[in-house]
């Protein structure tokens, strides 16, 4: 008998060796990166689109990108299938008999052990039993007809894959080699497969494969680095029947059976093993469900269990309807409300049934999730918990106590709201990631790295905090539930959670499918009485509901708006808020005192309404701030004067949205100036450079804090850095103006350099003063010596440091050298900070001197005239202006530039 790859079949099992079986690969090529991707087994290639790209790859999580190499996706798919060693014995029962102890067909060597098979890139995971053909020839071949790679590429040597990818059976297997001629033949294999009613046929050594593929339970592969940590367990019965848990993959030498034979051999040990594995993967969830039903736990635990049920839905399979979820919740509610009021429960059930009869009012997917073309910065708010639109709405209630959001007397509305949100999220997107994240509700106030949005407006008066209406950044509501009107999503309408001092009017605050998570496009309309209302471009607000939603209705800090509201109805412990919904009231508990954030004194004078026009554009959103009620005009005038004098932090100064837009505009001007300079238009580029420098100064002033002692280190660092960089840009502009003999403009630019450096030194002064004192204490003056009265402290410090350093060099005593070691090493940071401070002061004074020289040169060189005199006078006014009020200085600089350029 001829040898096959160095393996000589023995007489005991030569007749029982099965013929090798070919499992065919299916590949698809990306039309963008032209990389081939191995398709899962059973994929119907006729269902693939004509234009296929890597982003459509959905069977390997996190690998649907063109930058992933071809080998990575192939190896990742192969890694999902593992080989299980079958039993050593093979029973003889005929040509089409599959022994129960054999899980996958294989080839055996002379000693009865399993021969080492070559690992294939398309190894199939299948737990069904395959028959061993007793009448097959005993010869065991490893020719290329055992495998047909669809891309006509050579396969790596078998010994490499044997040692690398089958470590479990290495000690039982014998490495086999493959000749170059045999590998060459594998290039000419066909990619097509033939299936006829489940019976696989072999035509001209073109082996086919079964088109039904067993799915992969992701619980089997938690150790794979490409598998997400949050593995989805699939409850769907159809999914369970269609997909099965398997622990072994079919080898190259396996002979595929027909689908009918697989169904008839359903009772083999491998199927039993798979069933046990499948049951084990669902054990935790079933036990958790049983424990919840038996122990009658609190309602929020029910929500956690239901959230787990939502996460286990197959997002790419059949979708559940709202009614099915409501039926499930109603069945579980029987345990939750055990011993409760049955009459109230019946009323709640009737309300839900009525809500089902009004599908036209059910919130649409856009009410909870922003469209793909817009930034998903909008948030839903519920009792100090933010949930971004990217998160599953069921997490809104995950970490909350059972009575923190809704009382147990009204559980069904909360259930339905969560179910409605989850169902909409499932139906509105074809693929939802299982990884979720919670957004911290406490945003850093005035953070310079905020997105293009407005920072939250807060009131430091805690006694009147419930009377002030606040709006949060990006058009959302602020995090503190005690001072907001928090809209909550329900299937048929929205119920606003009102703070103390406000009363719900009508059945709901907003109705219809208005996108609540974002402001949308808001129009300003001044109705009679100067009441500003918001047109949400959906079902509009009713006149009696406008004040409840108006974010600027209470600009007066004395609670002007809340005087017209009905007194708050207090619940138990005086901390519950009641919402009017027709004749029904929902009791809300909030724990306001514990969750209320502390507010700095610098925010006490923040105004809500302003006479200034500020525009915010983000996506399709646009908010216009207009004047508010005349009753608050006196207070607004005082607040605005405080802002101009720099006495208090204003919304404009702390507005992250304005800072971001100003910074973007300044950078755009600088880039445009660079392009003009590259084209040789130096005069035009200089004007744009200087205008960009002025805008950078404005951005740095917005990051300032009026009270340096209470300022945050992050804001101070941002402001100092911006001032230092802007000073260099202004210096560049000044030198450019001097080259063009525009001395008046150069004087203005030098003035900006002076202001920028003085501002930077101003914020460095506290640390510089401490550094000076620290260094002063280190370098003590020797007894009997007294410094000159005309010398400064820094001069004394330098002179003593140098003299002692020289004496240290001259002496040979190590003790003397050790005494001055702290000055050289330990205080290096103090020295560097002090030098940076002195450098800023020196550069500022140098810019002052140059600005005076430039204005003098401009006055002597230009012809006298009224326009010239006015321009020079305005420039002198700018030069005499102090550096504290940057905004006023920028206004004067622009005015002077207009006068000198006319």
Curated annotation (Swiss-Prot):
GO terms for cellular component: nucleus. Changing residue 27 to A: Abolishes binding to histone H3K4me1/2/3. Residues 450-463, 564-588, 599-611, 634-648 have a biased composition (Polar residues). Coiled coil: none annotated. Zn(2+) binds at residues 30, 33, 54, 66. Residues 204-213 have a biased composition (Basic residues). Residues 151-169, 193-203, 214-233, 335-345, 612-625 have a biased composition (Basic and acidic residues). Keywords: Metal-binding, Nucleus, Transcription, Transcription regulation, Zinc, Zinc-finger. It comes from the Eukaryota. Residues 131-233, 326-345, 420-480, 537-651 are annotated as: Disordered. A zinc finger (CW-type) spans 21-74. InterPro entries: CWZF3/5/7, THD_CWZF3/5/7, Znf_CW. Expressed in leaf sheaths, flag leaves, nodes, internodes and panicles. It is found in: Nucleus. GO terms for molecular function: zinc ion binding. Residues 421-433 have a biased composition (Low complexity). The CW-type zinc finger domain is not required for nuclear localization. Binds to histones H3K4me1, H3K4me2 and H3K4me3 in GST pull-down assay. May facilitate the recruitment of effectors to mediate gene expression. PANTHER family: CW-TYPE ZINC FINGER. This is Cysteine-tryptophan domain-containing zinc finger protein 3.
């Amino acid at each position: 008998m001829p040898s096959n790859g160095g393996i000589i079949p023995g007489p005991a099992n030569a007749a029982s060796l099965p013929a090798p079986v070919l499992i065919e690969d299916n590949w698809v090529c990306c039309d963008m990166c032209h990389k081939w991707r191995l398709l899962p087994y059973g994929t119907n290639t006729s269902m693939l689109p004509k234009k296929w790209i890597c982003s459509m790859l959905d069977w390997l999580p996190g690998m649907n990108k063109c930058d992933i190499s071809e080998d990575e996706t192939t190896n990742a798919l192969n890694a999902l299938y593992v080989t299980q060693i079958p039993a050593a014995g093979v029973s003889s029962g005929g040509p089409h008999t599959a022994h129960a102890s054999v899980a996958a067909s294989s080839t055996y060597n002379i000693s009865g052990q399993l021969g080492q098979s070559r690992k294939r890139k398309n190894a199939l995971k299948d737990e069904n039993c395959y028959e061993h053909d007793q009448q097959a020839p005993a010869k065991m071949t490893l020719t290329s007809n055992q495998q047909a790679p669809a891309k006509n590429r050579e396969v790596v040597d078998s010994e490499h894959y044997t040692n690398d990818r089958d470590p479990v059976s290495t000690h039982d297997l014998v490495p086999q080699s493959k000749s170059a001629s045999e590998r060459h033949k594998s290039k000419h294999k066909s990619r097509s497969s033939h299936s006829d009613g489940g019976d696989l046929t072999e035509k001209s050594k073109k082996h086919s494969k079964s088109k039904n593929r067993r799915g992969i339970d992701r619980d089997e592969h938690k150790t794979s680095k490409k598998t997400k940590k949050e593995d989805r367990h699939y409850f769907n019965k159809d999914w369970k029947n269609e997909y099965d848990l398997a622990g072994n993959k079919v080898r190259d030498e396996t002979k595929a059976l027909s689908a009918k034979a697989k169904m008839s051999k359903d009772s083999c040990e491998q199927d039993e093993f798979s069933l046990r594995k499948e049951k084990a993967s669902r054990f935790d969830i079933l036990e958790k469900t049983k424990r919840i039903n038996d122990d009658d736990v609190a309602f929020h635990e029910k929500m956690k269990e239901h959230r787990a049920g939502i996460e286990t839905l197959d997002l790419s399979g059949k979708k559940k309807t709202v009614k099915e979820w409501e039926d499930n919740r109603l069945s579980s509610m029987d345990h939750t409300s055990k011993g409760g009021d049955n009459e109230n429960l019946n009323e709640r059930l009737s309300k839900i049934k009525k809500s089902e009869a009004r599908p036209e009012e059910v919130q649409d997917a856009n009410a909870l999730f922003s469209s793909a073309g817009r930034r998903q910065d909008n948030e839903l708010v519920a009792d100090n918990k933010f949930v971004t639109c990217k998160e599953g709405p069921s997490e809104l209630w995950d970490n909350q106590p059972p009575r923190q959001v809704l009382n147990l007397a009204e559980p069904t509305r909360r259930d339905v709201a969560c179910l409605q949100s989850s169902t909409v999220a499932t139906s509105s997107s074809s693929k939802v990631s299982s990884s979720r994240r919670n957004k911290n509700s406490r945003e850093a106030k005035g953070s310079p790295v905020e997105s293009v949005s407005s920072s939250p407006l807060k009131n430091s008066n805690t006694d009147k905090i419930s009377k002030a209406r606040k709006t949060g950044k990006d058009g959302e509501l602020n995090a503190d539930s005690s001072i907001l009107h928090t809209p909550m999503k329900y299937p048929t309408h929205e119920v606003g959670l009102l703070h103390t001092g406000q009363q719900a009017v009508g059945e709901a605050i907003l109705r219809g499918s208005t996108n609540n998570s974002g402001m949308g496009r808001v129009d300003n309309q001044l109705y009679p009485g100067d009441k500003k209302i918001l047109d949400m471009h959906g079902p509009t607000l009713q006149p009696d509901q406008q004040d409840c939603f108006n974010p600027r209705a209470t600009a007066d800090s004395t609670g002007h708006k809340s005087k017209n509201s009905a007194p708050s109805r207090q619940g138990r412990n005086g901390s519950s808020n009641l919402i009017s919904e027709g004749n029904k009231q929902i009791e809300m508990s909030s724990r306001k005192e514990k969750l209320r954030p502390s507010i700095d004194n610098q925010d006490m004078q923040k105004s809500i309404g302003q006479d200034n026009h500020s525009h915010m554009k983000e996506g399709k959103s646009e908010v216009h701030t207009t004047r508010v009620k005349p009753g608050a005009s006196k207070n607004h005038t005082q607040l605005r004067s405080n802002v101009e004098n720099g006495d208090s932090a204003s919304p404009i100064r702390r507005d992250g949205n304005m800072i971001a837009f100003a910074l973007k505009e300044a950078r755009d001007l600088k880039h445009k100036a660079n392009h003009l300079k590259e084209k040789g238009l130096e005069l035009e580029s200089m004007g744009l450079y200087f205008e960009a420098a002025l805008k950078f100064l404005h951005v740095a002033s917005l990051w300032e804090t009026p009270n340096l002692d209470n300022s945050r280190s992050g804001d101070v660092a941002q402001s100092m850095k911006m001032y230092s960089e802007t000073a260099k840009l202004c210096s560049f502009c000044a030198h450019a103006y001097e080259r063009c003999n525009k001395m008046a403009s150069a004087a203005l630019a030098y003035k900006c350099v002076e202001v920028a450096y003085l501002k930077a030194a101003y914020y460095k002064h506290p640390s510089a003063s401490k550094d000076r004192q620290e260094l002063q204490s280190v370098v003590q003056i020797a007894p009997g010596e007294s410094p000159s009265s005309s010398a400064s402290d820094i001069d004394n410090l330098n002179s003593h440091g140098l003299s002692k350093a020289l004496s240290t060099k001259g002496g040979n005593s190590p003790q003397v050298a050790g005494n001055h070691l702290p000055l050289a090493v330990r205080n290096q940071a103090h020295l560097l900070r002090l030098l940076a401070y002195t450098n800023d002061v020196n550069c500022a004074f140098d810019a002052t001197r140059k600005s005076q020289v430039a204005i003098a040169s401009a006055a002597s060189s230009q012809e006298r005239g009224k326009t010239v005199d006015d321009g020079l006078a305005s420039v002198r006014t700018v030069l005499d202006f102090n550096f504290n009020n940057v905004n006023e200085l920028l206004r004067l600089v622009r005015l002077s530039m207009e006068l000198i350029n006319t």
